[in-house]
């Protein structure tokens, strides 16, 4: 008899507080990660936090660094070369989504742990197992492994432009439609469904909706509210063993925009707008979702995304092709141009 086995990989430590740059070494020692570390950062995040963390780590570890500018397979390969040549035991990603995604995928391919040290709170990739990597000109979502620890310094994240925090709210409200799509796939395709993971995902969304006015204040408490929701959402995906609890048709819409729009907006911003439309298609209270995004100052239409309405329509019609195996409210054949235009107009997206 074949027995069902479900693997859940979760962060072993989550540290949320102030002035945590010197705590990375303590976490690494506690988790017995090893002596050789590769720290990844971008030009900006090196100055914001990376340089100070690196200096402190050198007191206890052998440290190598890699400066990266985008989440690409080329940069993943660069990291893998350093890991092999320098016998790296663990990685540290200091930055936003791109840096953490490269660290995440490189650690997975090399089978070494990594610590996530986010400098923005713009999406739930800071704690999830999935990496969004650009390869051959297009961004693709790749299953990897979650961080062994997440260290979120409120003081650092607070200094990022508020736009990133609002984008984090957009990524969180998308859990509402993602779970609906997951339930749909479970009923129609018999896909595995975890009630626990779905509940945790929905709780993350409800948390930011409830605290929208506090989040808009853009202070330490705002950051804490969003970060807790993002981490909970990432854990929900780890429990599910897939991105299903937090990624549905609204994410496919965002990925489609990434592929066709000359200047895409932030991931969370696009997902938030996509959620308004997908909530309408699901028969959910899309007006409440739109109101939440307005309350936190996130985009709710094409003009605020600074994307031509034509690309919104096109993205809606091709979204179902981004991941054909992922069943959503868009169905197997997707939306017609007429249906896409109607949904976007009714919801005020165009």
UniProtKB/Swiss-Prot annotation:
Its cofactor is Zn(2+). Substrate binds at residues 124, 171, 255. Its main location: cytoplasm. Its EC number is 1.1.1.261. NAD(+) binds at residues 97-101, 119-122, 128. It is found in: Cytoplasm. Binds 1 zinc ion per subunit. Keywords: Cytoplasm, Lipid biosynthesis, Lipid metabolism, Metal-binding, NAD, NADP, Oxidoreductase, Phospholipid biosynthesis, Phospholipid metabolism, Zinc. Belongs to the glycerol-1-phosphate dehydrogenase family. HAMAP family: G1P_dehydrogenase_A. This is Glycerol-1-phosphate dehydrogenase [NAD(P)+]. It comes from Thermococcus sibiricus (strain DSM 12597 / MM 739).
